[in-house]
Amino acid sequence: MIDLAALWWWKEYQLDHSQDEIIIAAASIYEMDPALIKAVIWRESRFNPNARGVAGELGLMQIRDVAANEWAKSAGITNFHHENLINAKSNVLAGTWYLKKAISRHQHTDDPVVYGLAEYNAGRSNVLKWNSEDAATNSASFIEAIEFPTTKNYIISIKKRREKYRDFK
């Protein structure tokens, strides 16, 4: 008889590694940490390339129209449609590009990833609202200033999951 715990572990292992090739390629192209990308995918879709969010987000990294169109334009892709984001490769490329853009805006801080994740989750306007006084450069103060519990949890869960994936390359 198969041990149920072993079966559960095996299924989780397979799911955790189902998009590795795409993640590594996107990380290389955009010079990002593959463990971070993988952690975002885990949080956003649990590795389901067909995931659909309530606000129109699609795919592994739950990309919305505006971000997808910005990425397509920057990549020189013409005739891009939001539904193309069901394609795992396009989705991870777009999401990684967008996350890199968000993180790069916060290089003056002690932890640009925290600010970038907040922007990825809650939008730039909210990050700018929370980004005052100490919170402008201190990530611990910034997290305290975040008004949405879901965004705080989002950042914390991704940072923890990133550590789990730290040896992933």
Segments (PLM) and residue ranges:
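Short glycine/serine- and small hydrophobic-enriched flexible loop segments
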Residues: W42, W97-S104
